[in-house]
Design a protein with these regions (language model features):
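PLP-dependent aminotransferase-class I/II
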Residues: 92-162, 170
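Conserved PLP-anchoring active-site segment centered on the Schiff-base-forming lysine
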Residues: 78-94
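Catalytic PLP-binding core of fold-type I/II PLP enzymes
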Residues: 151, 169-181
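A glycine- and small-aliphatic-rich helix-loop capping segment at beta-alpha/alpha-beta transitions
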Residues: 77-81, 101-110, 174-178
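Cofactor-binding loop segments of dinucleotide-utilizing enzymes, especially the Rossmann-like FAD-
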Residues: 64, 88-90, 125
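Short, small-residue-enriched loops and turns at beta-alpha junctions
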Residues: 6-8, 36, 129-131, 164-166
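Glycine-rich loop-to-alpha-helix module at the N-terminal edge of alpha/beta enzyme cores
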Residues: 3-83
Length: 181
C-alpha cells in the first residue's frame, strides 16, 4: 500500500517561512535514504503510527507527487514481481515519463513525446458527466482481464480518489471497494 499526500501550507506564512529558514541552517545534505534529521524521522514515525494495520511500515518523504508515484510503482513491481499497471481515464500522475504514461489524457501531457513505457493499461473512470457508470467501468475491467490483459501480470492499480485534472471527479466508494476485491 502506498499513499501520496500533499499539504497546502499557504503562501509565505510566517511560521512556515521560519521553519524553512531553521531547517536550511540544519541541513548538510538531503535525500530520503540519508536522513540524519530528527524532524524527518519524527514525522515518519508519526505517519507510520497513524497508518492502520498490523504490519511493518516504512515512510519515505519525497519532493513531488510524480516522484511519489514513480516510487510507488517501483515498490509495487518489486514486491509483486509483476510489471503491469492499470490507470484510469482523466487521471494525472505527473510529468515524468512514467507519470505521463499513467496519465489518462494525451494533450497536453503525452502529445509529441513518442513511445511511453510499456504495460500501462488505461480503463474508464466512472464519471456520470462522461456517461460512464460504475457498472460500466467495472465491466470494462472484467472484459479487459478476459481479452487483453492477464491479471496475473498486474502489479498495481493506481487511482486518484478525487481526480483534479480530470474535472474534480470523486471515485465512488463502491467502485473503490470493488477494485480492492
Amino acid at each position: 500500500r502506498s499513499s501520496d499526500l500533499v499539504n497546502n501550507t499557504g503562501h509565505r506564512h510566517p511560521r512556515v517561512m521560519a521553519a524553512v529558514a531553521d531547517q536550511a541552517q540544519a541541513f548538510t545534505h538531503t535525500c530520503f535514504h540519508v536522513a540524519p534529521y530528527e524532524g524527518y524521522i519524527a514525522l515518519a514515525e508519526r505517519l507510520n503510527a497513524a497508518t492502520p494495520g498490523d504490519f511493518p511500515k516504512k515512510t519515505m518523504l519525497v519532493t513531488t507527487g510524480a516522484e511519489a508515484v514513480e516510487n510507488a510503482i517501483k515498490i509495487a513491481r518489486a514486491f509483486t514481481g509483476r510489471s503491469g499497471v492499470i490507470s484510469f481515464s482523466g487521471a494525472f500522475h505527473g510529468r515524468t515519463l512514467l507519470g505521463m504514461a499513467l496519465t489518462g489524457k494525451v494533450a497536453p501531457y503525452k502529445k509529441g513525446f513518442g513511445a511511453m513505457p510499456p504495460e500501462i493499461v488505461h480503463a474508464p473512470f466512472p464519471n456520470a458527466f462522461h456517461g460512464v457508470t460504475e457498472a460500466e467501468a467495472l465491466g470494462h475491467l472484467e472484459r479487459l482481464f478476459a481479452s487483453s490483459v492477464d491479471p496475473e501480470r498486474i502489479a498495481a492499480i493506481i487511482i486518484e480518489p478525487v481526480q483534479g485534472e480530470g474535472g474534480f471527479n470523486i471515485a465512488p466508494f463502491d467502485f473503490l471497494r470493488a477494485l480492492r476485491q
